[in-house]
Amino acid sequence: MKTLTLVAPAKINFYLEILGDRPDGFHELAMVMQSIALGDRLHLRQRQGQGFQLGCDRADLEVDERNLILKAAQRLQRSFPQIGGVDFFLEKRIPIGAGLAGGSTDGAAALVGLDIFSGLGLTQPELEAIAAELGSDMPFCVAGGTQLCTSRGEQLTPLPPLPSLSLVLAKFESLSVSTPWAYGRYREQFGDRYLQTEPARRDRLQALHAGPLLQAMSAGDPVAIAQHLRNDLEAVVLPEYPQVAELRSVLGNCSGILAAQMSGSGPSVFGIAENPTAAQAAVEQVRQAIADPDLKLWVTQTISHGIQTETLLR
């Protein structure tokens, strides 16, 4: 039986600015997304007949039609009926409901995996276009690396690869934040600040292109990068979830941590560390400051790629 294993990296947001409303109900965004080494593994195995089945090593993850792996497989098969039956098995390592694109990267891995498995020969832009139908951050997960993401997040502009940055990632395991709630609350509280015209939004994007964050990233300067992080959703999530605010503060004040910020709509928080030793020391400092068994911490790093093939057996 033919098998394939892929690694699906998580992402963090170095930058998330909400520019305004879109006619389709989404928000117009300007984001800098970054792939990190923490990732899931998706195994594909050829099966007799048609159809797809999904298993997972986490009992608390849906493995039915709601899962983006199956949604992605079914969407691709509608365009390419020659795709045969496949059994998927997911080794879940990215925390669930964390603002790290765990579901989207798994769906992206399904698209990439089926393309390889079935010999479709799709280009990356073709895969990204299909991914955009399934989720706003799924095109980024296909591409990976360091990207400026605009529109609702699906329009990608590659940025120069970063040197490997050491990171600490932290999340209360049982806590999740609804992404629609976070954006809806932001609209309620700050909608009067939205840019109302296309020229105004275009000018804002041009300013971001020429601004200090992208300059720091081009220079590979972690200290300067840390000085220019931004996540607009912190303004609504942190007051509503004080434990996330405390976690962000504690991590950000650890020795050797240059800055800390929430990723996406949360509740995960990441810190940029001076080096791997400082990252590991920060983990111990956070554990001492917040003695909660529900708090999970990881030491990881930035990477320059998206979905990658690990093994292919024929």
From Swiss-Prot:
Its EC number is 2.7.1.148. One of its GO terms (biological process) is terpenoid biosynthetic process. ATP binds at P95, I96, G97, A98, G99, L100, A101, G102, G103, S104, T105. One of its GO terms (molecular function) is ATP binding. The keyword ATP-binding applies. Keywords: ATP-binding, Isoprene biosynthesis, Kinase, Nucleotide-binding, Transferase. Pathway: Isoprenoid biosynthesis; isopentenyl diphosphate biosynthesis via DXP pathway; isopentenyl diphosphate from 1-deoxy-D-xylulose 5-phosphate: step 3/6. The active site is at K11, D137. It is an enzyme of class 2 (transferase). Transmembrane segments: none annotated. It catalyses: 4-CDP-2-C-methyl-D-erythritol + ATP = 4-CDP-2-C-methyl-D-erythritol 2-phosphate + ADP + H(+). Belongs to the GHMP kinase family. IspE subfamily. HAMAP family: IspE. Catalyzes the phosphorylation of the position 2 hydroxy group of 4-diphosphocytidyl-2C-methyl-D-erythritol. This is 4-diphosphocytidyl-2-C-methyl-D-erythritol kinase. It comes from Synechococcus elongatus (strain ATCC 33912 / PCC 7942 / FACHB-805) (Anacystis nidulans R2). The gene is ispE.
